Amino acid sequence: AGYAEDRRIDDGLLWLLRMRQDDGGWTIPVLTRELKWDEIVRLTGGDSEPLQPDRSRPFSHNWTDMVLRAFTAHPFYKRNRDVRRAAELLKGSLFRPDSYSSYRDPRYWTRFVGWWPNLLTALETLTAMGYDARDPEICRGVAWLIENQAGDGLWDLGPGRPEKALEREWLALRICLMLTAQGIR
């Protein structure tokens, strides 16, 4: 992306590495604390002191996927040992419940909303890091996508999602790009 040599990018990625949970993945601090809703709103809705995470709590596959996307764009950091360790955590969590309440239902993996992590975003992230369908966990995710292609050649957006043609077409494009990057035609 042209920013590999930019010190600000380096500083940001190093900060993300320092913010990992003890298990090597990421989450957000408000999830690691037992907070009441009004406290979460106060902490996230205005000026407040930064909340430090409880690093002993487990990683979230959702937040780990989001953070790993930043590392995939950097030629050096996507090969970093700690980043690879986090990628292994993400890979091992495919189709499993998240550690935190908002995504505990494994069906969220196959609910395709453009801005939230799901099976496709995880496979895009892992593919960009060099993982391929020879890996059994990646193969299982790829197989799910292939097996769940609709008769019209597109994919459904997921349980409870209204079918919008344009969104389904964009989803199909992204899936096809990921499959092509995997060498699957």
What spans do the regions from the language model cover?
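Short glycine/proline-rich, acidic loop/turn segments that cap or connect secondary-structure elements
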Residues: 140-155
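An alpha-helical repeat/solenoid feature that recognizes helix-turn-helix modules
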Residues: 1-11, 22-85, 94-140, 157-185
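Short alpha-helix boundary/capping elements
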Residues: 20, 94, 146-150
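Buried hydrophobic core positions in alpha-solenoid tandem helical repeats
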Residues: 16-17, 86, 90-91, 145
